[in-house]
Amino acid sequence: MEIGGLVYLILIITIINLSFGETNNYCKIKCRKGIHTLCKFGTSMKPNCGRNVVKAYGLTNDEKNEILKRHNDFRQNVAKGLETRGKPGPQPPAKNMNVLVWNDELAKIAQTWANQCDFNHDDCRNTAKYQVGQNIAISSTTATQFDRPSKLIKQWEDEVTEFNYKVGLQNSNFRKVGHYTQMVWGKTKEIGCGSIKYIEDNWYTHYLVCNYGPGGNDFNQPIYERK
């Protein structure tokens, strides 16, 4: 389903309790480098954050819906040509911007990686269905409460201020705009995220990992079809 028409559907998440480890041998999944996250760390979902005091890991239903709605609202805004920021702006409207739906398998892989408290991208996160893209964000505050997912996602959205749609995505600008371009990659259909919240030296830290299928961010390719 695509954004850009008059009908915009917000999909309510249904959580399905699946054991993906029983149906997929992740150790056989090929990536450009490295061992698959679920092969390397298993599916126990236990956090591994050293001496940090973990307060929560995993996402609530409300947080999942918040993440999904935030992505689709932003994608809709871009697709309609309403995103005025950029170098230059506004961003051109799109005709192939899919409405994202939640994918529990992508979320399980993302959660397993978030649980490692490693603030780099994992090497291998593909599924049998998708080559998977990824966005990560972290926020720390002394306000004795954790930032909402939307505040972390805003970091990705704001990269649009550095994006030149006339140039597109290149190796030279990837570090500045790669989170934004993955968020609005037109052909991406599904998303699944993981989260961990912990306290380190009185800093309330929230680490968010989102996986996207199919992934985007192919250099020298349009991020979406323009109207």
Swiss-Prot record:
Gene3D superfamilies: CAP (3.40.33.10). Expressed by the venom gland. Pfam families: CAP. InterPro entries: Allrgn_V5/Tpx1_CS, CAP_dom, CAP_sf, CRISP-related, V5_allergen-like. Its main location: secreted. It comes from the Eukaryota. Disulfide bonds join 27-39, 31-124, 49-117, 193-210. Coiled coil: none annotated. Residues 1-23 form the signal peptide. GO terms for cellular component: extracellular region. Residues 68-212 form the SCP domain. SMART domains: SCP. It is found in: Secreted. Keywords: Allergen, Disulfide bond, Secreted, Signal. Belongs to the CRISP family. Venom allergen 5-like subfamily. PANTHER family: CYSTEINE-RICH SECRETORY PROTEIN-RELATED. This is Venom allergen 5.01. It comes from Dolichovespula maculata.
